[in-house]
């Protein structure tokens, strides 16, 4: 009976140690993933376009490109960039 209790206690101790190691590994992976997301976010902000292209949503902070104009078009409920019938200069 003593060996059975000792075996159960030993097994619980082993499971506790393994569980602690798994949690530490999971937390490290979570932190690494968060850092990766922040790096990708920063990279996408630097690659932001200077103007909105055709059918893109437009507003004061993000105007349309030179050959487009910002207009309200039904049934779309926001302003979009549409062609102003000119061609961009190259």
From Swiss-Prot:
Expressed by the venom gland. The keyword Cell inner membrane does not apply. Disulfide bonds join 51-65, 58-70, 64-81. One of its GO terms (molecular function) is toxin activity. It is found in: Secreted. SUPFAM superfamilies: omega toxin-like (SSF57059). Residues 1-19 form the signal peptide. GO terms for cellular component: extracellular region. The keyword Transport does not apply. Keywords: Disulfide bond, Ion channel impairing toxin, Knottin, Secreted, Signal, Toxin. Residues 20-50 form a propeptide. Pfam families: Toxin_12 (PF07740). InterPro entries: Huwentoxin-1. It comes from the Eukaryota. Ion channel inhibitor. Belongs to the neurotoxin 10 (Hwtx-1) family. 13 (Hntx-13) subfamily. The presence of a 'disulfide through disulfide knot' structurally defines this protein as a knottin. This is U7-theraphotoxin-Hhn1e. It comes from Cyriopagopus hainanus (Chinese bird spider).
